[in-house]
Amino acid sequence: MTCKIIGSGGYLPQKIISNDELTKFVDTNDKWIRTRTGIFQRHIAGDTEYTSHLALKSAQKAIEDAMISVDDIDLIITCTTTPDNSFPSVATKLHGYLGLTNIPSFDLQAVCAGFIYGLQLTNSLIVSGKYKTILLIGAEKMTSLLDWNDRSTCVLFGDGAGSVILQRSNDESGLIDSNIFSSGTDYEILYTSGGTSMNGTSGKIVMQGQKLFRHAIAKMLQSIEDLLHANQFSVSDIDYFIPHQANIRIINKLAELLNIEEHKVVKTVEKHANCSAASIPLALSTLKESGKIKKGDILLFSAIGAGLTWGSALIRW
């Protein structure tokens, strides 16, 4: 028994900032950014457009795609690092926006690996029989954490949200397996300079890019290889590889080491930038809207985020 995705939806804010526009207020250029990241634009939420608003718009699309009623949802989980408020949770605010009554809702914080963590948790809750229909969201306003004078970080991130509706599977489709990990001793590789109990501010993103690159390759590769081996899958069985959209060099290096064919690798980082927990569900929504994905396809997700947190998931569509 497992859970399956019956609907998906993504949302990106209307405002787009190109690499050339960034050069107006930070010492960088389009070639430098593209060469090192693969990014040439990012979507930016407005001053009064919060993470909960992004989450709502993606959730509405997923609900419509799943062809269910809002009232069918019996749990909301929002994966986010950038909540509107310290409390209440984004999920609880979304609960109110959707007009739901008394069902549980909460946020999950595993940064860029949040959606993988959320998938594993959602599967356990549905398999337990306690919940039938879960709305799982990755939503981020990462630009609220940026120091726009730091070219090593401000060029990397964007805002957006992706949602999926999951229910129990009655056939072979659904989550095959997943794994998740963390390493708290590596937290200084990627973190924010503030926090509610530390200094009462959200702080700004601080990153050791070279170290993060090495950890990302090693940890995601091991996670993927372990997952494939545990479930007796080979790389050739994968129809689509949807990695966390952090950096084109990480994506390309993983594909090379795994020997995954180019046409199987889903890449949205060039237009979306790094949307943290939203990146995988956004990429999934983009793939689904392209019409390429078909029933029975095997999808491989993998992500790494601050913490460090990381993991992978195998899904049969």
UniProtKB/Swiss-Prot annotation:
Its EC number is 2.3.1.180. The keyword Transferase applies. GO terms for molecular function: 3-oxoacyl-[acyl-carrier-protein] synthase activity; beta-ketoacyl-acyl-carrier-protein synthase III activity. CDD domains: KAS_III. It is an enzyme of class 2 (transferase). It is found in: Cytoplasm. Residues 245-249 are annotated as: ACP-binding. Disulfide bonds: none annotated. Keywords: Acyltransferase, Cytoplasm, Fatty acid biosynthesis, Fatty acid metabolism, Lipid biosynthesis, Lipid metabolism, Multifunctional enzyme, Transferase. Pathway: Lipid metabolism; fatty acid biosynthesis. SUPFAM superfamilies: Thiolase-like. The keyword Cytoplasm applies. InterPro entries: ACP_syn_III_C, ACP_syn_III_N, FabH, Thiolase-like. The active site is at C112, H244, N274. Homodimer. Catalyzes the condensation reaction of fatty acid synthesis by the addition to an acyl acceptor of two carbons from malonyl-ACP. Catalyzes the first condensation reaction which initiates fatty acid synthesis and may therefore play a role in governing the total rate of fatty acid production. Possesses both acetoacetyl-ACP synthase and acetyl transacylase activities. Its substrate specificity determines the biosynthesis of branched-chain and/or straight-chain of fatty acids. This is Beta-ketoacyl-[acyl-carrier-protein] synthase III.
